[in-house]
Amino acid sequence: MSLFRSRPAKIHFVGIGGIGMSGIAEVLLNLGYAVSGSDLKESEITRRLASLGGRVQRGHAAQHVEQVDVVVTSSAVRKDNPEVVEARRRKIPIIPRAEMLAELMRLKYGVAIAGSHGKTTTTSLAAHLLAHAGLDPTAVVGGKVNTFGSNAKLGRGDYMVVEADESDGSFLHIPPTIAIVTNIDPEHLDHWKTEEALRKGFLDFVNRVPFYGRAILCIDHPTVQSLLPEVESRYVTYGESHQADYRADGIEVSGHAVRFDAFRRDEPLGRFEVRLVGRHNALNALAVVAIADEMGVPADVTREALASFGGVQRRFTVRGEAGGVTVVDDYGHHPAEVKATLLGAREAFHRRVVCLFQPHRYTRTRDLLPEFATAFNDADVLLLTDIYAAGEEPIPGATSEALAEAIRACGHRDVSLVPRPELARAARQRVRPGDIVLTLGAGDITAAGPELLGLLEA
């Protein structure tokens, strides 16, 4: 595989520690390219890339791009970043992350999973399935897949499984042979501006599927179903609906596992089990059953693959137990994800749930405040902390205080505001033996779980 014919390329990633950027960087490193990058902080991800031969520097500086051939950025990188400014001055090509991902995908049959929620889990399941089936895929995922030990995998096979990011429209760079859409909810409206523009973006993504490919669409979701009259590519649907081409029935949630019967139209494919928490994961697994069946993977192989899936970090990850308290961490940061994860915690444990939630981005808090206000009903106790800005400037009215007031106004009886540095100590005062503590959010809330465990063990 060669992306550059003239000479080995030196590829530089601005913000290489991001989960989406690092996966592409790792694949390129494994292909033998000279990869460098910068990030504001050191992390497990940057240390891993350095161990693979990447040149990773802390902080952003113009001299980091002096000897590179191409600069890769994500939508989180500002145009006044010193490395971007210097690359522009030197006329070094600057390309978005999705364009580099698309270049890798052009050499493979792409399996691209998109959707407002569930895409990391579904992408991980799909990559695990193809690996289990002996197809040795390349994969780039938005989370660390436990069976791979990474968020990226370089395979020798013909398939590449990727998580398609709709947040900035960059998934429209991706050329999918198989495109999956799990759901479409109002999200990332700072980029899309309107829900109709977001819907049109997903439609354009689906219609990029070539004549020999297939779109796999969740008919249970009304916005996804509304696309069907306008879809020009060949497609099949999946869901619990009796109109679905691939249907799940007899869904059973039992502890840390979900089981369901799968049908292709009226033909039974058998009963499947996946060790994931929450009823919603039946549909994520069903999407993978549909992928496998459309690719000709035998149902027995799919059944074995789903049963052996080891999960994804920060997707209902049990961080530990101390003092009779179990601490679980999850990336959920959209109201629909919050609801599903809290319900999953209740179904899995049947115990009191204490939720530590960190809102992510001012724009999301502002745009989805009414939805957030009713998302925490399955939390017995809610400790709400400061908004994680993710590079955004504050917005008047988009505050944790406003969110707490909205949640209380909708009837929640136990909501407290706690500054992030005090969160673990506040949780320590509220928990009791038998509780489930769920840390929720896409920011640094993930560190609160280990902090609490340390206090409980002291």
Swiss-Prot record:
It catalyses: UDP-N-acetyl-alpha-D-muramate + L-alanine + ATP = UDP-N-acetyl-alpha-D-muramoyl-L-alanine + ADP + phosphate + H(+). InterPro entries: Mur-like_cat_sf, Mur_ligase_C, Mur_ligase_C_dom_sf, Mur_ligase_cen, Mur_ligase_N, MurCDEF_pg_biosynth, UDP-N-AcMur_Ala_ligase_MurC. ATP binds at residues 115-121. GO terms for cellular component: cytoplasm. Pfam families: Mur_ligase, Mur_ligase_C, Mur_ligase_M. The keyword Ligase applies. Its EC number is 6.3.2.8. The keyword ATP-binding applies. Pathway: Cell wall biogenesis; peptidoglycan biosynthesis. It is an enzyme of class 6 (ligase). Belongs to the MurCDEF family. This is UDP-N-acetylmuramate--L-alanine ligase.
